[in-house]
Amino acid sequence: MDARLLEILVCPVCKGPLHYDRGAQELVCNADKLAYPIRDGIPVMLVDEARQTVEGTPVDPAGPAQGR
């Protein structure tokens, strides 16, 4: 995932930051607990396509899954 793209994309619900989960190929909003899929390298930023993340397991923005 292109780091420049990650800098401009925000959660479509709360307009908050997203974190790249490389293993799951998702962009995650910890505030709304939503994960948006990345298909064929393209983020699908539709709320209807997002999945709920597990309560209490936020993506660590400083962790190894963070795209930079």
From Swiss-Prot:
What InterPro entries does this protein map onto?
Trm112-like
At the top level, the lineage of the source is Bacteria
One GO cellular component term of this record is: cytosol
UniProt lists the family membership as follows:
Belongs to the UPF0434 family.
Q: Which HAMAP family match?
A: UPF0434 (MF_01187)
- Please identify the protein, giving its name as recorded: UPF0434 protein BTH_I0741
Instruction: List the source organism.
Output: Burkholderia thailandensis (strain ATCC 700388 / DSM 13276 / CCUG 48851 / CIP 106301 / E264)
Classification from the root reads: Bacteria, Pseudomonadati, Pseudomonadota, Betaproteobacteria, Burkholderiales
